[in-house]
Amino acid sequence: MAKIRVYELAKELNISSKELITLLEEEFSVEVKNHMSAIEDEDANLIKELLSGKEKSEKTKEEDDEIETTAKNPIKESMNNKKSNKRDDKNEKVNTENAEDMGIITMTSDTITVKEISDKLEKSYAEVIKELMLMGVMASVNQEINFEMAEKLAAKFDMEILKEDEDEKEDLEDILKDNEEEEYLQKRSPIITVMGHVDHGKTSLLDAIRKSKITSTEAGGITQHIGAYTVELNGEAITFLDTPGHAAFTAMRARGAQVTDIVILVVAADDGIMPQTQEAISHCKAANVPLIVAINKIDRPGANIDKVKQELTEYGLVAEDWGGDTICVPVSAHTKEGIDDLLEMILLSSEILELKANPNRKAKGTVVEAKLDKGRGPVATLLIQNGTLRVGDSIVVGSTYGRIRAMFNDKGRNIESAGPSTPVEILGLSEVPEAGDKFYQVKEEKTARGIADKRKEKIRDEYLQSTHKVSLEDLYNQIQEGTVKELGLIVKADVQGSVEALKQSLEKLSTEEVKVRVIHGGVGAINETDVTLATASNGIILGFNVRPDNNAIIASERDGVDIKTYRVIYDAIEDIKSAMLGMLEPEFKEVVIGTAEVRQVYKISSVGTIAGAYIQTGKLARNAGARVIRDGIVIFESELASLKRFKDDAKEVAQGYECGLSIEKFNDIKEGDIIECFIMEEIKKKTL
């Protein structure tokens, strides 16, 4: 059903928004928050009719009085009519001004400059500054004033000011107001999260369930990022989320628990309850999510199912066969024993939960994972929790938006639409969203862009906080001197899941002396914008599996910003921890001596892959360390196996020259790759 905003109806009725809001509450018992609230057209028409009838009644009474007065004194009436006409014209003008809602203006953040509010008020700078002076505030054109001051200033000019994020909230409420009555709801598939300690066999269990090999393709057999998969059993679908088991990825596990219906807690029969198992249990209890325990590795010689059940009772989980209500299923991912029993228990539990959704409403759900793909742009894995998402739909995701250009299911097949409980990979977003962000389908891309822009502006304003410079090496001294009360970190990684994990782990390091705050986290190479943000907020930049580009390196050297890069997530955490405790004593420092761009690639059967490269900065030296960087992400790290200038071996090749090179144990060099050459330089130990 169509709706109309309060301010629009006020204009039609020729009254102010405030008057209409009061009227709605007192006479019609309709509660509205502000002028941007929407009411049904049916209610609006009723209000118009009632007010119209009231006006007619008053008008008839006035006309009767006028006839009586005219009969008594026709000359006086003639003069009064002239005055009355002028008065009516004047009143009409005032009412017209009121109908424009006293000139309602909006603010997108907590502060606004004098120049901006002058433009919004359509007043000269001098008038606004004069009013501020009368209020006891001395402000220049570019100076900012807070919302309270702006509100008082607007009132001086008979204007009303509102924060735009309230409007945004109402916009989304209107967009998402769909009928959720029982007749519209249909049964949906359960969403299952698999949790547990590292090496207890979560991925192997999923592998056994899906009857496909994914464990062998992942480094070290450990799932590094959340994946979503759908399997079918007896014609019924089940959606699985696979969350990593490392303690550092607590945030990713917590995110999984928020979108799941049932948790499968994997516990190794030969290992029992471990730290990550305890954390998983805590997340399930906090989210009030039903839990099924899969006791894995029952084929191992040291397996003890009863011992696991005994340990579970310490956390309030009593097995059904022990008189409790926790479902425990012994399984073996290796021999496939108990897999069917586990799936049956999942379907049985989902039937008890009576999971339902409305597939005919606008889609909404959660971002499971997001990344930047070289050929396809921003790619996001979405889990649809309600409604149906189609190719061509416009969506808003956190502070980004887009129109879906293509959609793929978990098998990689191109699909046109997807309903509740379905994981999909989509293309078409303007930027890479945050993992865990909610997404909402909106009517058109313009609406999505508007909401995303408001959110982005708010986030940007929160970033720009500044203090003084700090580096990791002298952090402890500055803490002791009291010059550092807050350590700001900018975290960049190759995928969003790693950003979130680092953020969660780093912020836990806060102490009474210094608070650790991740002021920004993003996906992709470290760029100049990150350095600018670090400069403004006195931050340190941490890179995980990514490298800074040339502009970022130049800017960091110019502004004195510390950039640290890591391949292992725990090294980053330990470095910050050690620096804060005053135990950071580096023995070697990495020095980048040069970079080269691969212009051409030659494959020689007896030798391997040879790259023809152009030295962009510094120099390349034989036997020095070398990294292969593709799209800002470190692909491989080793050392230069050979370095030639024409046909001759060269010890080093300087900037501006071309050379031929090969990387030790690496043959997948491609045109456009950047080769970064570095040496490890010994430095004196520091006592911080």
UniProtKB/Swiss-Prot annotation:
Keyword annotations of the record: Cytoplasm, GTP-binding, Initiation factor, Nucleotide-binding, Protein biosynthesis
Domain tr-type G: 187-354
Residue ranges, annotated region (G4): 296-299
Sequence segments annotated as region (G2): 221-225
Residues binding GTP, per UniProt: 196-203, 242-246, 296-299
CDD domains with a match to the protein in the record: IF2_eIF5B, IF2_mtIF2_II, mtIF2_IVc
GO MF term list: GTP binding; GTPase activity; translation initiation factor activity
GO cellular component: cytosol
Region (G5): 332-334
Biased composition (Basic and acidic residues): 53-62, 86-95
Positions of the UniProt region annotated as Disordered: 53-100
Stretches of the chain forming a coiled coil according to its record: none
NCBIfam families for this protein: IF-2, small_GTP
Family: Belongs to the TRAFAC class translation factor GTPase superfamily. Classic translation factor GTPase family. IF-2 subfamily.
Protein name: Translation initiation factor IF-2
Organism annotation: Clostridium botulinum (strain Kyoto / Type A2)
